[in-house]
Amino acid sequence: MESSTTRQGHGEPARTPRGTGPRVRDPLALLTAEFDGVHDVWRSAAGTVCVAGPEPARAVLGNRDGAVAETADFYRTRHGDFGPRAAQIRIGRAGRALIRRHLDARRPELPALVAEHLVPSSVWPDAGNLLVFRHLRDVLLHRGASPQLHATIGQIVHRAVLAGARRRHSPPSRLLFRRRALSVLHAEIRARQREFGSFHEPRDLLDVVVRESEPGSDPKDLAEVYLSFLFAAVGSVGFALGWTVHLLGTHPDRLAMEPSWTVREALRLWPVAWLFARTPSHVQRLGGTEVGPRDRLAVCTYLVHRHPGHWERPDEFVPERWAAPVPDGAYLPFGHGPHTCAGATVTMRLLEDLVGIITRDRWLSVTHDGAGPQVGPALAPPRFTAVLSDRTGCPGRR
């Protein structure tokens, strides 16, 4: 797992820079302050081994030679990784196919959806999450499901998926809601397990999870896998849309650029999945730093995407950089290796469609208070208001 990079200083053990400012609690700000732009791997002041270089990041996430304990981020449950691996693959493949069919069928509805939810103004990042939820709600849960189940899924989105939503409720309230919501989900999963085989095609993603898992799987584990779909589809995709809208609104000279460029550049600057935790399987050297099973590795794709040795103008919004080949090895918005996000392709397509519709025939302006990202397991945009207005006589993007 030794980094193969030969830039000056990379072969030396990393040193944690000593700062004189106040103690930083924000983990993103802490990692950014510690990264010196030279050492790709270092041991942070908190003891975590941080990875910011593309090569060691790919080595860790790709798990070359079994260097780290096998971990599936999407399928991680309270009881460990959901499995077996064959079931993960089946669920991912079937879920991706179902979402793709849904997007193909509902693509013509997107312009009206944008007009209804975002025009003339909208408050983000919630607007992005709720727009995606509205567009995907039938694939998340089929229309024939019980009103109680539909209400529960909607409450989960509002109380747990939206940025900062959990902070708006007290710990006892969150615990009580979690118990009630999981009770409803567990009951539905048990019912679908009993009726397994009575339907030929999956009606929604919950069917996919039940059908493609191993017989006798614990409903509690299946509920967590289903919630991973919900959080990824509504949370991650919504936040990625929010970052793209925020950047375009604050860089109006970039509005006419190709949606594929702006989406990719937004995910470079602000990768929603920004931090991946891993545990070394044995003592080894990673980028000049000795690590072992007692260490916690933190692969920070935010820093990989802004690495000054691999990107020109790394901290600037430059969508046009995607008009030419880019250093793919330093671009990991969906992770890397065997557990790369299975829905990356369909996610990018939906984002590009939405950004194209938002910007094609409208002016976009954004007002915000200058706050930074909302940092958590996902990297969410700050709160801002987006205003869309028609371009009089605009011929549209060609």
Residue ranges and their predicted role:
Residues P17-F35, A256-T289:
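Conserved cytochrome P450 K-helix E-x-x-R motif and the immediately C-terminal K′/meander segment
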Residues D65, C300-P325:
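Conserved cytochrome P450 K-helix/beta-meander segment immediately N-terminal to the heme-binding cysteine loop
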Residues L136, L205-A266, L351:
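Central I-helix of cytochrome P450 enzymes
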Residues V346-L379:
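Cytochrome P450 heme-binding "Cys pocket" and the immediately downstream C-terminal segment
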